[in-house]
């Protein structure tokens, strides 16, 4: 455990940010799985939006976001 006051605060913030980021990534994964289970235009838009939000927040790399959206788009086109 940290001894310096600022380090203690940063450790607490790290825990909060980790929870927030984990929840955001989980929501993204859930949206993708929902689309894969039942491909539809509405679920595609929701999954695509969730991927874009995760990319904007820096949770996933822009290339991964692009790759994921391309794969979902290909499944929708089938």
Swiss-Prot record:
UniProt superkingdom: Bacteria
Keywords: Ribonucleoprotein, Ribosomal protein, RNA-binding, rRNA-binding
GO molecular function: small ribosomal subunit rRNA binding; structural constituent of ribosome
InterPro entries linked to this entry: Ribosomal_bS20, Ribosomal_bS20_sf
Cross-referenced Pfam families: Ribosomal_S20p (PF01649)
Gene Ontology CC, one term: cytosol
Record-linked SUPFAM superfamilies: Ribosomal protein S20
BP GO annotations: translation
Its job: Binds directly to 16S ribosomal RNA.
PANTHER family linked: 30S RIBOSOMAL PROTEIN S20, SMALL RIBOSOMAL SUBUNIT PROTEIN BS20C
Family statement drawn from the similarity comment of this UniProt entry: Belongs to the bacterial ribosomal protein bS20 family.
Stated name of the protein: Small ribosomal subunit protein bS20
Gene: rpsT
